């Protein structure tokens, strides 16, 4: 590792005799990982943990995940990502690098980012995957936190997610929020809501029939948030959600992930051992 990070995690998963094992678990600085054995399907399940409770101004973090051929892993954050105020104007950054080999399957279920008053944050995620691999990837951002409980008091938030299949860029999504320069309540931004989440699913098993069936499934639920599903140019879809609370949004995310798990892979619903999972 040539660059020094304030927190660094590297997880590697392999298939051994039909069972996925973690062959690499490295942690450094403020970052830690914790295993959980609650998944009824025997899928390795890891929490990403920040020992400081949040990201401090100017800090840089790296998460690297490698899923080898035929392996299946589930990775999530223990809590939302708190980005503390940046009084000196320095940028806080996190980079995530994911590699998925042939017929591998990763469920990366990150909680939303909560930017504090005056914070500046840049998050990048690059996923390199084989065309036969399966991916569920979620993240999000809220209206933030301030002592006065006023929304959108942070200065800068940028999130760039890119997916490559066989070295070709097939998906690129960027969220850029500068509340001092933008009206966060108008059409095209938060539109009066306080929480935004997105979910990307890529799999050779996702086609237009699956997307329509998922849409119908979600419409049959009693949901509090607004959402929209779009098919990708490749075999996949993207779900975007605006909601009153992060818990409302996560309910939709988990419903989508469970539908994919059950319909495509014959797996039981997610059990992430988080408070809002039991609501």
Swiss-Prot record:
Subcellular location(s) of the protein: Cytoplasm
Q: Which GO terms describe its cellular component?
A: cytoplasm
Mind telling me which InterPro entries this protein's record contains? UreD (IPR002669)
The source's domain of life comes to Bacteria
Query: Is rRNA processing included in the keywords of this UniProt record?
Result: no
Q: Does the keyword Cytoplasm apply?
A: yes
Q: What's one GO MF term for it? A: nickel cation binding
Which Pfam families does the annotation name? UreD
The UniProt keyword set, sorted, is: Chaperone, Cytoplasm, Nickel insertion
Q: Which HAMAP family match?
A: UreD
Biological role: Required for maturation of urease via the functional incorporation of the urease nickel metallocenter.
Assembly and interaction partners: UreD, UreF and UreG form a complex that acts as a GTP-hydrolysis-dependent molecular chaperone, activating the urease apoprotein by helping to assemble the nickel containing metallocenter of UreC. The UreE protein probably delivers the nickel.
Member of which family? Belongs to the UreD family.
Protein name as catalogued: Urease accessory protein UreD
Q: Which organism is it from?
A: Streptococcus thermophilus (strain CNRZ 1066)
């Amino acid at each position: 590792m040539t660059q020094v990070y304030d927190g660094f995690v590297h997880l590697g998963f392999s298939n051994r005799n039909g069972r996925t094992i973690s062959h690499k678990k490295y942690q450094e600085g403020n970052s830690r990982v914790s295993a959980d054995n609650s998944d009824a399907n025997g899928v390795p399940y890891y929490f990403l943990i920040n020992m400081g409770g949040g990201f401090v101004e100017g800090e840089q973090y790296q998460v690297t995940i490698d899923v080898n051929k035929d392996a299946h892993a589930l990775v999530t954050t223990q809590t939302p990502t708190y980005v503390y105020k940046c009084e000196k104007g320095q940028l806080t950054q996190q980079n995530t690098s994911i590699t998925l080999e042939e017929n591998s399957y990763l469920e990366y279920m990150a909680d939303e980012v909560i930017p504090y008053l005056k914070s500046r944050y840049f998050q990048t995620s690059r996923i390199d995957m084989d065309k036969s691999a399966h991916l569920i990837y979620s993240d999000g951002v809220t209206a933030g936190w301030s002592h006065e409980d006023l929304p959108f008091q942070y200065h800068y938030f940028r999130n760039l997610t890119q997916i490559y299949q066989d070295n070709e860029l097939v998906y690129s999504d960027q969220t850029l929020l500068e509340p001092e320069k933008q009206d966060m309540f108008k059409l095209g931004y938060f539109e009066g809501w306080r929480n935004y989440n997105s979910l990307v699913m890529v799999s050779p098993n996702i086609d237009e029939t699956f997307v329509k069936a998922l849409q119908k499934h979600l419409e049959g639920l009693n949901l509090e948030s607004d959402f929209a599903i779009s098919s990708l140019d490749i075999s996949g879809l993207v779900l975007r959600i605006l909601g009153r609370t992060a818990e409302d949004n996560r309910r939709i995310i988990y419903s989508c992930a469970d539908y994919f798990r059950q319909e495509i892979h014959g797996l039981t619903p997610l059990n992430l051992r988080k408070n809002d999972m039991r609501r």
